[in-house]
Structure formats: C-alpha cells, structure tokens
A protein has these predicted regions:
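Asp-box/WD-like beta-propeller blade repeats and closely related beta-sheet repeat scaffolds
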Residues: 122-162, 509, 516-541
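Structural detector of coil-to-beta-strand junctions
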Residues: 493, 520, 543, 565-566, ...
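Right-handed parallel beta-helix
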Residues: 474, 479, 499-510, 525-538, ...
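Acidic Gly/Asp/Thr-rich repetitive segments characteristic of extracellular carbohydrate-active
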Residues: 407-454
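CBM-like carbohydrate-recognition segments
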Residues: 6-10, 21-54, 66-78, 82-108, ...
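Extracellular beta-strand-rich solenoid/capping regions of secreted or surface-exposed proteins
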Residues: 442-450, 462-478, 486-504, 510-527, ...
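Oxyanion-binding "anion nests"
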Residues: 238-287, 291
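Long, well-ordered core segments of solenoidal/helical folds
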Residues: 20-39, 74-92, 125-144, 184-210, ...
Length: 786
C-alpha cells in the first residue's frame, strides 16, 4: 500500500459515488469538528499520547481500508508523526509510568508500517519501544498486569483492551517462533485470571476492577472487588476478546477459551439490557435504577463485539436475529442528525475510574457524577467498527468517483477501469525467455519496485522455474508488444497480490511438465486489477481464480481446457475458476471445455481474518460466453451478491444436464447454508449444438428448460446491485459474436485459441480426455498437442 500518496493526489479532488454509509459519515463528522487529530477527545490542539485518540484513529484506518479514504489516512498519519519522531521517541511517554493506557495508541503504527514500510522507520520503532514496556510491566501474584504504576496491585477490565490487542498483534508479527505459544498463553492468562478475579457470582457480571492488596478505599476488604459492574469497563473486555482473537492461532488452546468467554457475554448481557431499547446502562448491574441512564459507549462496544463475533464464526448463527437487531436500535437511540449534515453520538460517559487524586470510590453515585458528553472517542471508534461490520454484512458500499481521471487504456471497462498500472514509471524490456531473474527477464521486471511497464523484444514460451508472484504495485505488462506469436507462460502459476496491476495479451498455459497442482492465473488481497485479452488454460487446479480482491475487471479472456484427470490430489479437477470479490466486473470472457466452475462464485469460507470487510461485495458477470461445461456451468455464491446479465450459455458434447440449468444457486454445510442473492437478466441458453443429442445421447427437454427460466425469473432480485462502474451490456447473442471475434490474446491468436473458437462456433470438440474420454474436456495438454 505504499501507493497511498499517489492515490491521494488523484482522489482528493474527486466527488463521491453513492450515499456515504454511517462509518464514513462519522469519520467526516469528526474531522469537520476537529481540524486535526490533536483536537479529538476535547484536547483543543494539545499533543498527548492517549489511548482515546489512538482508538478512534485506529477505526479511521480500518474504514479507510474498506473505502479508500487517503485524506483520512493522512489525518491519522499527521497525528502519528506529531507524536513520535524519526527515532521512535514518543512525546512525553515514560515507560517507567507502566501505564497500560499508553500501550493502546501504538496499534496504529502497525498499520502505518504496512502502508509505508521503511520509508518512515519511526512506525516500526514505536511498536518496538512500546513492546518493551510489556516485558517489565508490573504484575499481580497471579500474573495480571497492574493497571498503572500509580495503581499498584490493581487489575481493571479497561486494561484488557489497553494492552492485549497490541500484545497479541506484536506477537503474531514479530514474536520469536519458539516463544509464540508461551506469549499467546500469557495473553490468554490475562483474560482468564482477570475474569476470575473480577467475577461477581451474584450477577454473573464482572466488576470494574480488583485490588489484589485489598487496601484501596474503593474495594471490598474481603474480595478486593470494586462496588459495581461498570458498562464501559465490561465493554472494553468484550472488544478486547474479538480483537485479540484476530491474532491468536485457531489451534492454540487459548483460542477456544476466549471464544467461550465471548459467548458467555452473549448469554448474560441481554438480561441486563433495557427491555424496550435493547441498550445497556452506565452502571451495568443497576438497570432501571433511578438516575441511571442508557450509555452509548458501552452499548456500541457490546454490539461491535457481537457483530464481529458473528462474522468470524465465534458466535452461532442461532443468535443472528438478536445481534442484527441491535445496530438499528443503537442508531435510533444514540445517533443524531445535525443541521450541518454531520452526525453525533449522544449520551457518552466522559470518563470513569477508581481512586487517584479524585478519590473515585466506584459507587453508584460516583458513576453518575461523571459528565455526559457527545462524540466521545471511546464510543466513536467502536461505532465505526460496528458500522463496518453492518455495512459489509448488508453489502452497503460507497466509492470515491474517479470520473475525469485517466482510464487504464482505451477499451478498459468496469470496476477496474481506472487501474493506474505502471503509468509514468520506468520501462522494462524483456529480452530473454529465461526465468533466472537476471536483467532482461520477465521475473526481473516483475520483481522490481516502483511504477513500471513491461514490454517485450522477444516472443515464445517462458518456462517458469517457480511461481511468478506479483507483489509490488503499479505494474503494466503489455504482451501485445512481443513480436511474432507473442508470449506464453508455462509450467508454474502467475499470482497477484499487488494493487494497480494491468496485464494484457498474455497466454498462461500451465501444463503438467512441472507436476504442480496450481491455477494458471490468480489474484487475492489486491485492488485495482485489470486483466485484459489473456488466454488461460491447461491448469491443474482452476484455470483462473479471482476472489478476495476489489475494484477489478477481468475482460475479454479465454479460460479453456482445464486439465481434468491430471495431477490434482482430489482426482478429476478440470475447473474453470472461482470468481468473486467486491466491486468487480467480469465481462466478455469465454469459458470453454472446463468440466465445472465456469465459474464457481465465491463463498465466505474462502475469506479469512477481516477480509470479508474489505474484499467481498457485488460481483458483475456480464456478456460472458460459457461452452461445453461438463458437470456445472456457474454455481455457488453463498451469502454473496451477483449481477448475472446477458450471458450466453451453450451446452456442448460433454454437458450432462440439458434442462436449462446454467446457474446452480447452491449451498453446502462446508461453505454456507445461506444462498447468495442474484440479479438475473437477459441471459441466453442455446441448445443448437445438442439438439440432436449430446452427452450419452441425451436430448434437451424444452419444458424443463422453460421451467428453469421461470425459476430464474422468480428468484432474481428486483434491482441490479450497485457497483462503482456499471457495465454497458449488450444483448447476449451480440456479446457471443463479439467474444468469439475478440477474446483471448487475439492480436495474434495461436493455434490453440483458433481451434477453441472454431469448436465453440460449430458446437463440437475435436479432442477428448485420454483418461476420462470426455469430449473437449482434456486430461493432459498432450491430449491436444499431437
């Protein structure tokens, strides 16, 4: 993501597309109220290393990852750079204070380091410096962190969030391999011991704090417990759980322990909520008591923890209706529309603590004595996180408009239309077909850094020695510049994880020579991808799989002849691809002679960690041609959103089912039992190639075909799902002709593509699998290289 500065220059002048969702609206509102981040939390421009600002800015960065808000990233970065110098020295930070609150704000420096790398080394230095505090943080005899040096022997629930998400993320990123298990065990112990020591058996809740010494005036001299369960303290506990679980390995014994604790909250907290609004009280264990009030920050913390727990699978779907009902109730109760277009969060407790100079004794009257304010950072941050969960779950999207900006190239369409590629950068000329990484090779140019465009002075086959991974952003590969027959990549896969990549007029024909099980081409965890006029075939897994990515277009490609009974460990696996993502366009592509997955639409189990927030949403599948599938054409799409518009489906000699089913809206227990949502319009089903008998002599039944058409009409969504750049579609028969004329590396089609196009047009298959005997669906590239 080192390209953020470049994107900033492009996008800050742009208008917006669509209505801003609540997460973005709250960020905009906060930035309007606070000209820079030193004004957040009522600081009035005063610099302070404080957890409240760090918490809110962390949520800003998370929203920026979903919605691409470079000006917001700069807002965060300005504060981060103000608070720490290039040596990583933090303004007025003293390790000797051993204040766990001072650990929390360092989390944003992980994200900034990911974005800017070693361009600014302060980000890594800050996290290293804060990590040193944990090593010597004083602890109770049972191993929990003291809350502060000035609060000796005290464990506050607040401290769970202040220290443990940072501790867990640092351990995952940088912890010594041989120590990780024990470090994660220590993190889990902080929760389990802290929960045991703060638990109130009378209510099933957890008290705000515990004093191991039993000497503080605010604690019970027998138990060491404070007087009440405070709403926000319990909220800190809840969100600490879901944040730490992001980093704790699933096979670590502590993972199940923390999931159990989260589910315990779901079991007990609803009993203490207001029965009418569903929200929680400032003094959590005294709902409805005179003077007590429904408090926003604790309520949104619980809602965020439950929403995230539901998405991550920590919480059973049986609780889905209850959890999904909470967020709208919160909006109704606590979010106010302001006359200037901003929004505000009401009824936030300004602060809550125990002891100290204020002699805070933690009784009911104390908690009610603290000021009630609006837009408290401690509520705004969790509100943005909860909103992101809600927006991703309901496919609520928003895009900065790129109208007026240069497009990738003439003819670029769809959501990847504005990919920058290597524009304005260095030209690398490929002069050798070798794959040793030396200057003049494709690998050397791909692995270079900075904006770059790759052209070719040679033609022929590049036999990869290992996968070609495109990790560095701002890259254009122009296969059409090669002389003669062009460029074909063989033996290993090409895999893209970089933003702003354009690939045009290449052939990827994997084959079995290397004995690898792989896709020929794939992409994950990237944005602004454009794949144009490529020919992709002979893969031993899927030919081409694109999902878990965003703002992309795959257009005018041929995806053909995935090898079926080949080297795949599962056996027959001649699959076209898995396609999905968020705000992506697949148009004018040809699928031919693939046994299944033409394509398979994605499902949620293909996404991990927080990818569903950023990389899953609307998919457009428009004006594509699918020919001679074996088992299935399109299927899947569980829990997704798809526009399937004016495609052309042509069963061939290997197609088993001729009853008009070209889209199987399927579910399974291993993926999800919730069907995807589809807008289905204008698709064609052409039986002319099999009218006199297809696979095993089967003939199409027109009544079944008609019934299938009625089914698609009935299950279709009434409106097309929105994307940033909707495709201008054409009628399916016209698209069919255009695809056959122009798809693939068509500037100079090779014999393979020419044969494929001829077979699609004639409704035939010249070759068959040498093992399976399926017409057109081959088992080895040698089945056609005769």
């Amino acid at each position: 993501m080192k390209q953020l500065l470049f994107i900033l220059a492009m996008l800050t002048v742009a208008t917006v597309y669509g209505q801003e969702p609540y997460s973005v609206r709250m960020i905009r509102s906060e930035m309007q109220r606070n000209p820079d981040a030193t004004h957040l939390d009522g600081r009035g421009g005063e610099r302070k290393w404080n957890y409240t600002t760090g918490l809110e800015l962390k949520s800003f960065l998370d929203a920026s990852r979903r919605y691409e808000l470079p000006e917001v990233v700069e807002y965060v970065r300005a504060w981060a750079d103000t608070m720490a110098n290039e040596k990583g020295e933090i303004y007025k930070y003293k390790k000797s204070n051993y204040n766990v609150d001072h650990i929390c704000p360092a989390r944003i420096y992980f994200d900034l380091h990911d974005m800017y790398g070693d361009q600014d080394k302060r980000y890594r230095r800050v996290t290293r410096k804060i990590r040193e505090q944990i090593d010597s943080q004083p602890r109770t005899q049972s191993g929990e962190f003291w809350h502060k040096q000035i609060y000796p022997h005290q464990v506050w629930l607040d401290g769970f969030y202040m220290a443990l998400p940072f501790y867990a993320e640092y351990t995952k990123r940088y912890g010594p391999k041989e120590q990780k298990d024990s470090l994660f065990a220590d993190i889990v112990h902080q929760f389990t011991a802290g929960a045991e020591n703060t638990f109130d058996p009378a209510t099933g809740l957890f008290r705000h704090a515990w004093d191991e010494s039993r000497s503080m005036f605010w604690c019970d001299p027998q138990t060491g417990l404070s007087a009440h369960a405070w709403g926000r303290a319990t909220g800190w506990y809840a969100i600490a759980l879901v944040e730490v679980l992001d980093y704790l390995p699933k096979d670590h014994p502590g993972h199940a322990v923390l999931v159990e604790q989260l589910n315990y909250f779901l079991q007990v907290l609803p009993k203490w909520a207001d029965p009418e609004t569903g929200m929680w009280y400032q003094v959590l264990d005294c709902p409805g008591r005179e003077g007590n009030y429904q408090e926003a920050t604790c309520s949104i913390m619980f809602i965020y923890a439950f929403l995230k727990g539901l998405r991550m699978g920590y919480i059973d779907r049986a609780h889905e209706d209850y959890i999904l009902g909470l967020y709208p109730k919160f909006i109704d109760r606590f979010i106010r529309e302001n006359a200037d277009g901003t929004i505000s969060m009401t009824d936030c407790c300004a602060v809550g603590g125990l002891g100290g100079k204020q002699m805070r004794k933690g009784d009911f009257d104390y908690y009610l004595s603290e000021p009630i304010i609006e837009n408290d950072c401690k509520g705004v941050g969790p509100f943005i996180w909860a909103s992101l969960e809600w927006e991703a779950r309901h496919n609520i999207d928003w895009f900065p408009s790129r109208e007026g900006l240069p497009i990738a190239f003439e003819g670029a369409e769809g959501c990847g239309k504005y990919s920058v590629g290597g524009r304005g950068g260095k030209e690398y000329v490929v002069t050798s077909l070798a794959d040793d990484g030396s200057e003049g090779t494709l690998r050397h140019a791909v692995e270079a850094e900075g904006p770059r465009t790759i052209t070719f002075d040679v033609s022929g086959d590049i036999h990869l020695r290992e996968p070609l991974n495109i990790r560095n952003p701002y890259l254009t590969i122009l296969g059409q510049t090669a002389p003669g027959k062009g460029i074909t990549i063989r033996d290993h896969n090409v895999f893209i994880t970089a933003d702003h990549v354009i690939i045009r007029y290449l052939r990827m024909r994997l084959g079995t020579a290397a004995g690898v099980e792989a896709d020929a081409l794939g992409a994950r965890h990237c944005r602004h991808l454009m794949i144009d006029h490529c020919s992709i075939s002979w893969a031993t897994d899927e030919n081409a799989s694109f999902y878990n990515f965003a703002d992309a277009t795959i257009q005018w490609c041929i995806i053909s002849e995935a090898l079926n009974a080949s080297v795949h460990h599962k056996g027959r696996h001649g699959y076209g691809g898995i396609w999905g993502g968020r705000n992506v366009s697949f148009h004018h592509n040809l699928f031919a002679h693939n046994n299944s997955r033409n394509p398979r639409f994605d499902h949620p189990k293909l996404y991990w960690d927080n990818d569903l927030l950023h990389y899953r949403g609307t998919v457009e599948f428009v004006n594509n041609v699918v020919y001679n599938w074996g088992m299935k054409a399109i299927y899947g799409g569980e829990e997704g959103w798809f526009n399937v518009i004016k495609n052309y489906f042509r069963p061939g000699p290997a197609t088993r089912n001729l009853d008009g089913e070209w889209l199987d809206i399927s579910t399974s227990e291993t993926t999800s039992m919730i069907k995807g949502r589809f807008y289905i319009h204008g698709n064609s089903y052409d039986i002319s190639a099999v009218e006199d008998g297809g696979f095993e002599g089967r003939k199409p039944e027109k009544l079944k075909i008609a019934n299938q058409g009625h089914y698609y009409y009935n299950v279709s969504e009434p409106k097309r799902f929105e994307v940033s750049v909707p495709l201008l579609d054409e009628h399916a028969p016209y698209a069919y002709e255009a695809v056959l004329k122009h798809a693939g590396a068509s500037h100079r089609r090779d014999a393979i593509d020419r044969r494929i196009i001829k077979e699609v047009r004639k409704g035939t298959a010249r070759y068959k699998g040498s093992i399976t005997g399926l017409p057109g669906i081959i088992d080895s590239e040698n089945d056609v290289l005769k």
